[in-house]
């Protein structure tokens, strides 16, 4: 059994090494890529800028600087960011830096907006994958961002949830302006909401009018999942 385990690990290591060899460009190739990003979440605090430096790497080094043009896409408003139209890899180097600044302009606390940055390929240069930033408005220092998503079933009107400030005895956010059911009446799909919670003590409560289980629900604080259910 021990030999089998050893051989298995050796096989996995060789397979992983072979896989990496297939994905990495050979030295000297005219190829450039952004540093690895598997989605990047950006939260911009009120009245502040959020600078983000992104590294760009090439597979070769040349004696002259190289300028790579960029294309921007997504639904993030142009006033919400500053991005150069190109990035430069200096002479005698294989690394450049793209300086991006996200701004507190036309951001939404509930719905993330996206900005995708692409390097333009040319006959002289192959490029890697795009990078996409998910950008949202954050909260002031001392407050946490509460964000909730509720997937509605066939009877959306029977769901009522609220967050209660137990120190003040007050409802700070709910899916209905008046305590009670009906806030989601006529709606479908996934409904989202968010707010900023100052430091304090809070209780999340959810009610189902027919007590037969509502749709899936989850909520986070500052991006960290606190609760999730499958709707059962």
Region locations from a protein language model:
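Surface-exposed interaction regions that form or flank ligand-binding interfaces
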Residues: 13
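C-terminal motif of bacterial Sec signal peptides marking the signal peptidase cleavage site
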Residues: 16-19
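Loop and turn regions of beta-sandwich accessory domains that flank beta-strands and are enriched
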Residues: 68, 130-232
């Amino acid at each position: 059994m021990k030999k089998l385990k050893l051989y298995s690990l050796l096989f996995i290591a060789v397979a992983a090494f072979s896989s990496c060899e297939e994905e990495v460009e050979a030295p000297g190739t005219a190829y450039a890529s952004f540093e690895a990003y598997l989605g990047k979440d950006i939260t911009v605090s009120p009245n502040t800028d959020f600078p983000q430096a992104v590294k760009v790497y090439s597979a070769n080094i040349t004696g002259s600087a190289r300028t790579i043009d960029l294309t921007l896409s997504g639904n993030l408003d142009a006033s919400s960011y500053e991005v150069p139209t190109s990035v430069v890899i200096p002479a005698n180097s294989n690394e450049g830096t793209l300086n991006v600044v996200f701004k507190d302009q036309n951001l939404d606390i509930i719905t993330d907006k996206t900005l995708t940055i692409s390097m333009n390929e040319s006959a002289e240069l192959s490029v890697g994958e795009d990078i996409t930033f998910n950008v949202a408005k954050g909260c002031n220092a001392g407050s946490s961002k509460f964000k909730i998503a509720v997937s509605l079933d066939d009877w959306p009107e029977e769901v009522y949830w609220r967050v209660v400030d137990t120190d003040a005895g007050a409802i700070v956010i709910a899916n209905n302006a008046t305590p009670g059911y009906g806030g989601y009446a006529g709606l479908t799909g996934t409904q989202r909401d968010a707010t900023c919670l100052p430091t304090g003590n809070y209780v999340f409560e959810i009610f189902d009018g027919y007590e037969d289980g509502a749709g899936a629900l989850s909520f986070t604080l500052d991006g960290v999942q606190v609760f999730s259910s499958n709707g059962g």
